[in-house]
From Swiss-Prot:
Location of this chain's protein in the cell: Secreted
Domain LCN-type CS-alpha/beta: start-end pairs: 20-85
Organ and tissue specificity: Expressed by the venom gland.
Keyword Zinc-finger: no
SUPFAM superfamilies: Scorpion toxin-like
Function description: Beta toxins bind voltage-independently at site-4 of sodium channels (Nav) and shift the voltage of activation toward more negative potentials thereby affecting sodium channel activation and promoting spontaneous and repetitive firing.
Descriptive protein name: Toxin CngtIII
Database matches in InterPro entries: LCN-type_CS_alpha_beta_dom, Scorpion_toxin-like, Scorpion_toxin-like_sf, Scorpion_toxinL, Scorpion_toxinL/defensin
Gene3D superfamilies, per database record: Knottin, scorpion toxin-like
Amino acid sequence: MNSLLMITACLVLFGTVWAKEGYLVNKSTGCKYGCFWLGKNEGCDKECKAKNQGGSYGYCYAFGCWCEGLPESTPTYPLPNKTCSKK
């Protein structure tokens, strides 16, 4: 029983430690989600936690929304073979 608890705790820990992080990216333009209030930022946090993103926490870093705890399926900046175009 103790072994099962230890294995479960390790799996949870690995999932938390190895979670993806990065800048949120607009898939159509290839650009980062921008922000102006550096540090704790409600807009970035809300975007990161949105169902389509799946992150656990977001804040403004270097004028872009940085997300932590993202699933591997969520794309982050830069997108492969796509440059930022603000058209």
